[in-house]
Regions:
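Extracellular/periplasmic catalytic domains that process cell-envelope and extracellular macromolecules
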Residues: 1, 63, 92-95, 106-109, ...
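N-terminal anchoring/stem segment of glycosyltransferases
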Residues: 1-66, 241-244, 248
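Catalytic core and acceptor-binding pocket of nucleotide-sugar-dependent glycosyltransferases
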Residues: 57, 121-249
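Conserved hydrophobic/aromatic beta-strand scaffold that supports enzyme active sites
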Residues: 58, 99-101, 113-115, 195
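Short aromatic/hydrophobic "clamp" motif used to bind/position activated sugar donors
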Residues: 69
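The conserved acidic donor/metal-binding loop of glycosyltransferases
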Residues: 73-77
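Conserved donor-nucleotide/metal-binding helix-loop-beta segment in metal-dependent transferases, i.e.
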Residues: 78-111
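Short glycine- and hydrophobic/aromatic-rich loop-to-beta-strand nucleating segment
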Residues: 107, 112-116, 120-121
Length: 249
C-alpha cells in the first residue's frame, strides 16, 4: 500500500476560521482513509512573498516522506468522503509522470489540487525553479503562473506533468468561464463529485458561506442553487454571524 499524505496551507486567524469547513473536511477525509494530513500555517510562510508562494516549500518539506502527496488549496471542501484517492485520482497519473493537475472550468491550468509522486527529484527541482520566477511574485495567479510558465516553456517539464481535462474529478468549480454558476458550456460541480474548489471567490466569509451551504446540500443529496450562488457572489457577508444568518433555510 502506498504511503499517502494530504497537504494544505492556511494563514491568518480570520482566514483559518473562514476556511474551517474545508479544513475540517480534509482532516476527516484523511482520518477516514488512513492518510497522513499536514496543515501548514505561519510556521512555513515566507513573509517576503505573497502567501500562496509558500506552497512550494511546504510540499518540499514532506516530499521524501510519502509515496504520493495530494495537495488541496485551503479554499476547497471535500464533499464526497467515500471516494478514495487510490480509486478516484491515482489512476489519472501515468507511471512515467510525477505531477497531476487540471485544466479547469475557466480554461486555465490550475494547481489548486495536485497529485505528486513522492521522492521525485524532478518535482523538487521543478518547484525550486518555479519558486525562482520572482518577476511573477505579484502576478494575479502567483505560484500558479510560475508553474504554467515552466510547463509551457520546457518540453522536459511538460513530459513529467499529466493534465486532466475532466477537471471535475478532483477540482470542480461552482463558477464557470463566464463567471456565473449557470455556465452552459462548462461542467461545474454536481452532487456526488469529490470536492469543490472555490477559485475566484475572494471574500473569506463568502467562501465559508458557500462551503457550509454546499456541505448541507451534499448531505441531503441535493444540487446547489445557481441563482443563490450568483447572488451571494456579488454580496459577500461581512462576518461569520452574517454568513450564518443567510444559511437558515
Amino acid at each position: 500500500m502506498p504511503r499517502i499524505a494530504i497537504l494544505t496551507f492556511c494563514v491568518g486567524a480570520d482566514y483559518k476560521k473562514a476556511m474551517e469547513p474545508g479544513l475540517a473536511s480534509k482532516r476527516a477525509y484523511a482520518a477516514n482513509h488512513g492518510y497522513a494530513f499536514h496543515e501548514g500555517g505561519e510556521d512555513v510562510w515566507d513573509r517576503a512573498r505573497p502567501i500562496p508562494w509558500s506552497k512550494f516549500k511546504f510540499i518540499e518539506k514532506y516530499l521524501d516522506d510519502y509515496d504520493l502527496l495530494f495537495w488541496s488549496d485551503a479554499d476547497a471542501i471535500i464533499l464526497n468522503q467515500d471516494l478514495r484517492l487510490e480509486d478516484h485520482v491515482l489512476p489519472l497519473l501515468p507511471a512515467d509522470k510525477d505531477l497531476l493537475w487540471s485544466f479547469d472550468a475557466c480554461n486555465h491550468y490550475n494547481n489548486g489540487h495536485l497529485l505528486l509522486r513522492g521522492k521525485s527529484a524532478w518535482v523538487r527541482d521543478y518547484f525550486r525553479r518555479a519558486y525562482e520566477q520572482t518577476d511573477l511574485l505579484y502576478h494575479i495567479w502567483w505560484d500558479n503562473a510560475a508553474m504554467i510558465r515552466l510547463f509551457e516553456a520546457n518540453p522536459a517539464d511538460k513530459g513529467k506533468i499529466e493534465t486532466c481535462r475532466d477537471h471535475w474529478l478532483f477540482n470542480a468549480y461552482v463558477f464557470g468561464s463566464n463567471n456565473k454558476a449557470t455556465s452552459p458550456s462548462d461542467r461545474l460541480y454536481k452532487p456526488g463529485d469529490f470536492l469543490i474548489h472555490f477559485a475566484g471567490v475572494y471574500d473569506p466569509w463568502n467562501i465559508y458561506r458557500m462551503m457550509t451551504y454546499a456541505s448541507q446540500q451534499a448531505r441531503k443529496g441535493k444540487p446547489l442553487d445557481p441563482a443563490l450562488l450568483e447572488a451571494w457572489r456579488t454580496a459577500p457577508p461581512p462576518s461569520k454571524s452574517a454568513a450564518d444568518a443567510t444559511l437558515n433555510f
